């Protein structure tokens, strides 16, 4: 059992087997590995962030665990979909990708359709029976690392 009640800094790897409770600020400069239960009031990741622009038909490269992809002006016909590949060296085939729309575009949704080691696909779909009109979309992504 590990209990941290004050501010603590670990410069390398912190490996815990068993229950862990962190009530102070804990900074790990390397890898935090927990086998068991980790209880924390909040967890903050101070990793890299990326923003890239694309034309909705070109693939993009965003090598970080989270970031924002900004499209150039585009439009989708009624019930039309278009996908593009996000090349990302952080992604493994078993990871989970979460998308949120930073800019709201009525009836145009973003979904992840394929995850492979080194890349994932984003599908833009117009769910309406009318054309979408011109739009510029900002999509936030986050990679949740999962064990194989």
Where are the predicted features?
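Extracellular receptor-binding modules and their adjoining Ser/Thr/Gly/Asp/Asn-rich linkers
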Residues: 15, 21, 33-95, 102-108, ...
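Register-specific beta-strand positions within repetitive beta-rich fiber domains
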Residues: 1-37
């Amino acid at each position: 059992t590990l209990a941290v009640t004050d501010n603590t800094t670990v410069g390398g790897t912190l490996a815990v087997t068993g229950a862990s409770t962190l009530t102070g600020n804990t900074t790990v400069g390397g890898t935090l590995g927990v086998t068991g239960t980790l209880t924390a009031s909040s967890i903050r990741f101070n990793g890299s962030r990326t923003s890239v622009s694309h034309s909705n038909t070109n693939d993009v490269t965003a090598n970080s665990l989270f970031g924002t992809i900004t499209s150039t002006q585009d439009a989708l016909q009624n019930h039309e979909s278009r996908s593009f590949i996000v090349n990302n060296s952080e992604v493994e085939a078993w990871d989970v990708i979460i998308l949120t729309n930073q800019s709201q575009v009525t009836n145009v949704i973003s979904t992840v359709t394929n995850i492979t080691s080194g890349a994932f696909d984003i599908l833009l779909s117009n769910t309406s029976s009318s054309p979408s009109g011109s739009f510029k979309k900002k999509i936030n992504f986050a990679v949740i690392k999962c064990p194989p």
